[in-house]
From Swiss-Prot:
Keywords: ATP-binding, Cell cycle, Cell division, Chromosome partition, Coiled coil, Cytoplasm, DNA condensation, DNA-binding, Nucleotide-binding
Gene: mukB
Protein's recorded name: Chromosome partition protein MukB
InterPro entries: MukB, MukB/SMC, MukB_hinge, MukB_hinge_sf, MukB_N_dom, P-loop_NTPase
Pfam family, one: MukB
Organism annotation: Salmonella heidelberg (strain SL476)
Residue ranges, compositional bias (Basic and acidic residues): 1051-1065
Amino acid sequence: MIERGKFRSLTLINWNGFFARTFDLDELVTTLSGGNGAGKSTTMAAFVTALIPDLTLLHFRNTTEAGATSGSRDKGLHGKLKAGVCYSMLDTINSRHQRVVVGVRLQQVAGRDRKVDIKPFAIQGLPMSVQPTQLVTETLNERQARVLSLAELKDKLDEMEGVQFKQFNSITDYHSLMFDLGIIARRLRSASDRSKFYRLIEASLYGGISSAITRSLRDYLLPENSGVRKAFQDMEAALRENRLTLEAIRVTQSDRDLFKHLISEATDYVAADYMRHANERRVHLDQALAFRRELYTSRKQLAAEQYKHVDMARELGEHNGAEGSLEADYQAASDHLNLVQTALRQQEKIERYEADLEELQIRLEEQNEVVAEAAEMQDENEARAEAAELEVDELKSQLADYQQALDVQQTRAIQYNQAISALSRAKELCHLPDLTPESAAEWLDTFQAKEQEATEKLLSLEQKMSVAQTAHSQFEQAYQLVAAINGPLARSEAWDVARELLRDGVNQRHLAEQVQPLRMRLSELEQRLREQQEAERLLAEFCKRQGKNFDIDELEALHQELEARIASLSDSVSSASEQRMALRQEQEQLQSRIQHLMRRAPVWLAAQNSLNQLSEQCGEEFTSSQEVTEYLQQLLEREREAIVERDEVGARKNAVDEEIERLSQPGGAEDQRLNALAERFGGVLLSEIYDDVSLEDAPYFSALYGPSRHAIVVPDLSQIAEQLEGLTDCPEDLYLIEGDPQSFDDSVFSVDELEKAVVVKIADRQWRYSRFPSLPIFGRAARENRIESLHAEREVLSERFATLSFDVQKTQRLHQAFSRFIGSHLSVAFEDDPEAEIRRLNGRRVELERALATHESDNQQQRLQFEQAKEGVSALNRLLPRLNLLADETLADRVDEIQERLDEAQEAARFVQQYGNQLAKLEPVVSVLQSDPEQFEQLKEDYAWSQQMQRDARQQAFALAEVVERRAHFSYSDSAEMLSGNSDLNEKLRQRLEQAEAERTRAREALRSHAAQLSQYSQVLASLKSSYDTKKELLNDLQRELQDIGVRADSGAEERARQRRDELHAQLSNNRSRRNQLEKALTFCEAEMENLTRKLRKLERDYHEMREQVVTAKAGWCAVMRMVKDNGVERRLHRRELAYLSADELRSMSDKALGALRLAVADNEHLRDVLRLSEDPKRPERKIQFFVAVYQHLRERIRQDIIRTDDPVEAIEQMEIELSRLTEELTSREQKLAISSRSVANIIRKTIQREQNRIRMLNQGLQSVSFGQVNSVRLNVNVRETHATLLDVLSEQQEQHQDLFNSNRLTFSEALAKLYQRLNPQIDMGQRTPQTIGEELLDYRNYLEMEVEVNRGSDGWLRAESGALSTGEAIGTGMSILVMVVQSWEDEARRLRGKDISPCRLLFLDEAARLDARSIATLFELCERLQMQLIIAAPENISPEKGTTYKLVRKVFQNTEHVHVVGLRGFAPQLPETLPGTQTEDTPSEAS
């Protein structure tokens, strides 16, 4: 018996609490006991990690996380490791006694994600003496050790002889090694397998019934029947391939038009490009010649434009220069006109102001006289008023003093003081210091006499003053007039200067009278001078335009000559238009005819091509439409004969095929129903029994059995008698023979053998004579021989049928071609060649174009000459009337002479205009200038002094009179005399006072009224003086401005200046207009030159490019033509009808064909590449290569042994026959490969029965398992009702659903899925395809339902669910299920693994304290019976008497955490023996 492999130990290196710890594992149960956090789960996690190093699956959670879908970020592994390199290693011994150490190197990855890096490895050939901890650690001293890295471990193991170290990059390779060496029970090929294994371990670890496993027990317990599935898949693949081949043949048969389409599109694609290049080459040659002609024409035009530009530029320069001088002259004329207008306005102002000044001067003189008289009267009134005032004051003083003296005694003293005061004033005024009251009277007379004398002297001086003042005024007036005319001068010179001025004034007045005649004469001469200058300019311009200088005498003769030339050129131009119209009309007619022929030419060419093809196909030459219709009648007769012969051959071929099919039935049964009846009756066909008879014996046995050679041999006829009742589905004659099929012989008949015949004695009264058949078919050898001869005959018939079919098709195609020709081309095929007519008309068109170009050139020259002559006549028409002006050479001198005289006259006119009035005034008073009244000033001084003396004498006389009057105050009389005397005096004084006051009032009134009048007179005088001075000043300013202007302001000056300005403006406008015309013409000429230059450059570039293109295309075209001729495709590519299409139409035709070709050759890499290369427009030869490649490809696609023509289209038609034969063969092959639905159902039923038996065997091992109230555990396997119905229909009712299984569009899997949907319409299939559903239905596991049942207490058999069981019962039941799964995996894997290996069995159980002692004992018993290892963990020792128990205690020593481990073996009668190496604590050492 093969010994089962075992796990020897688990080693943890640098885990949390375990620096270097090796746990020796018991052969049955290893218990880990300890409190919470002691390290039990860490130890199991290390074991699981080494077993399944897949981070996507590992998730170590505590019991509070049970069933959680997510835990901590590191899935519980990162926190169980320490920093640095960590190891988890499993030491195993397999069935071959090979020691294998498998494990993983773990290392924390720095970062927030708390990731762990895992590297699996395996060690083989390690000696038993070497411990795992010695491999991965290096001892530094007694208390220090270092963990080796994986590379160091590899180097260390490489030094050990016979030890193999393997590091794995994939988990699949790691598990593959473990499976091959017997460490795990199942080959884990994929992540799905690893997930199942991990879920099993996880379910074992955490205990209970795992819903993840119970829901998918079929995947865990039932092995995949891959052989059956692969057989189905291979069969379906063969059928699919066969159907695809058939479909491809059908597509090929239906793609005959596609191949024709490929040839047609390839021809269109290449021929269109070929003809386009041919057309372009011809067009490029024509364009190159046209470019060259246009280049020469443009050069001539550019030269003419350049000459024209130089002439216009020169004329424009002259006009620009003339414009500057004209603008200056025009501006000067405008300024002169403005000055003249200004001078005229100034002159008008001066005249107006002079008239105003004369009037003001008269008024001023009159007002001076009035003011002088008023002033004298004012002086008199002032003196009179002053005297009256003094007299009143004196009288008032006297009267007041007298009143005061009368009133009081003191009045005398006041009067005396007043008398003394009056005496003092008199002394002062009269300059008499010795004056006394007594002498006052004498002095009064003296001073009154002096006053009288002064008054008389004043009156005398006043009379003299009046006379002198008149003479002085006349002299000053005359002097001012002379000074105004001549300027400042001495008074003594005034007389002489005045006489000279009067004489000069007479002369100036005479000259001024000549201004107007001179001005009119000058204006006339200037007008003639300007006309002369204009005529000279016109003559110069005419000579310049004519390019020749002409004398004045030659102009009239030239005028007549130009008019004659105009008349002759006009006739030529008018006749040229008619000639040009006739040429153009003929050209248009030719063009229209050519266009009509070009439209007709493609139709004619297509008809000719069709006619040539018909001639080639039938080998006849046709010259008329009647011959074509006659030949068509012959074709119809030939076609009918060929069809009759083809149908006869086809009927014979079908008969041979039916015979071959009948002879090809398995077992020699010619009727399929015989096989079904033989199976039904439990017998064997007689033909099967004699299937191995030799070919030589076949005639004998065929004659021996005769009609009964298709009998069924059954063991007992009596047993099938009942089955014969009501039998209808059978041949008309059914022979049944009783006998043992294994030892059957021919002893049932009595037979006599004759020559090539036998006599069979069926009964005493019935014999049968049968001759040996010439073609026996009894026995496999005879049938095969007959089938072989039939196949040979069938090949001959097929070939003949194909030939006849091809001939018929060829005749039909030819008939169709004739019909198409008659319908489309017969009306034009036998007409004249339009291309020859086009060539003739093109020659005539070229001649017309050349004649038209010559005519246009001549006509243009005549038009130019005509325009030049008309322009010359127009210029002469303006010049001839001015010939007399051109001949007048003294005109300019006369103008200068008159201009000088006019200047003198205008100067005199200005003098007369300025000083004429002064001279007129001076003439009557010039005589007063002879004597100068110089004494007038002295007289005025004497008069003023006399007036002052008279005023002083009057005051002195008045003062002395007052003293005399107060003389009484100096001595008083007595009171009475004083009163009487005073009374008289008072009365007198009062009367005198009244008279004096009245006089004073009158004097005041007169003075006041005369003062107001004097003030009024003075204001008027001041106003007149101010106005006079202002206007005088303005007049002086105007005269100065007029002198500054320097222009003669006469009556005709403005008209002449305006006329001159207008003439210059007209000249300037004409000059500018001509300049603008020249500038526009010059701009147009420059633009034309620039356009011509650009055009010339473009033409040169285009010509060179076109020439290079022509040269390059010539080389490429030669290569294309050489390739075309070498491959013999010129006839197919040179399609003349395409020559009449435009390049765009040909390019469009080629592009459309290219698009169709891309689709057509998409599946052919070679043609696709050649087509892609042919798309290069610069390499036209590649299109030829593609065309040749298409024809070569079509030739290669057709079998060479049946090709009878070089035309691939005809060869494709011949291939139709071969494809038809292949279709028939593949159809028969598909019938042979067809899957029987009944056989499928039988296979699935047998597989289900086998697996049900295997599950029953597994249940026998679980009958004695009990946990708590659970007495037994079993697996219940049932077939689903829907799938059972499907199997029944497949077995018994398949005929009802043959529409699915006989469909060529559905595979068997798809048909099966459709049948399932038809039987179960209530089931939603979701998004799955019928193929997927069918493949699932071919898997027997999908037909089964599995569930776990437990026999619990009084409830009997119940479905195992966690809610119906206690925790311990659920753990035990789940463990039982897991043991079944492991055992099932081992059974499934025996055929994959070596027969000499029994894999390790190990499960886990965490928190085992939830089981009672009986359940624990059951587990121990189950492990012992199944040779399974179990690792359990519990807070305390569960069953230390069995297996191996480890006590784990986590301690902290010097801030270092470690786990203290003590291990004990199971109890025995002897004292318990401590396991080696576990008595000391596992004190961790610091890694160096």
